[in-house]
A protein has these predicted regions:
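Conserved GNAT acetyl-CoA-binding A-motif
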Residues: 143-145
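Acidic (Asp/Glu-rich) sequence patches and key acidic residues
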Residues: 1-139, 149-150
Length: 150
């Protein structure tokens, strides 16, 4: 049985304008992952999120759950997949974390780098491009990708 990834990129534009603690600094959905990434290569899922990690990557963002401050759009989309009974591995990662990752780091065999399985030249490239642009506009800590698996 295959594992599919779904999710959304969110941003918090008010945080840069008014500060992260302002009541108007809430998360907004930006774009559905489905529109940017048409693949579910397991090596990429392993190195990013620890899903099907037969490769021995040190995941960047494993098992963090659904953010408590997720946007209403994200909560609605997540619920449409059945929520916790029907999905697993829910997690999130900020653009700041993606940008700071060691993309030369390899799996346990030393044969696959993060860049080769989930870098700019893979199906993840469009996701990173959108997050990069939103990070330039709103700040790297105020852009995140929230994903779940089914």
């Amino acid at each position: 049985m295959s594992t599919e990834v779904s999710g959304l990129i969110e941003c918090r534009p008010g945080a840069r304008l008014w500060g992260p603690d302002d009541e108007d600094s809430v998360w907004h959905s930006a774009i559905d992952l489905f529109l940017l990434n048409n693949g579910n290569a397991y090596a990429g899922l392993a190195c990013l999120f620890g899903i099907r990690n037969y490769f021995g990557f040190r995941p960047l963002a494993e098992g963090r759950g659904l953010p408590g401050d997720a946007s209403e759009d994200l909560r609605t989309e997540y619920a449409s997949y059945g929520g916790p009974p029907d999905v697993h591995g829910t997690t999130w990662i900020t653009w700041a974390e993606v940008a700071a990752a060691d993309w030369k780091e390899t799996d346990s065999s030393g044969s696959r780098s993060r860049a080769s399985v989930a870098g700019d030249e893979t199906n993840w490239g469009p996701v990173w491009s959108v997050m990069r642009i939103l990070g330039e506009l709103h700040g790297a800590d105020h852009v995140r990708l929230v994903v779940w698996f089914h």
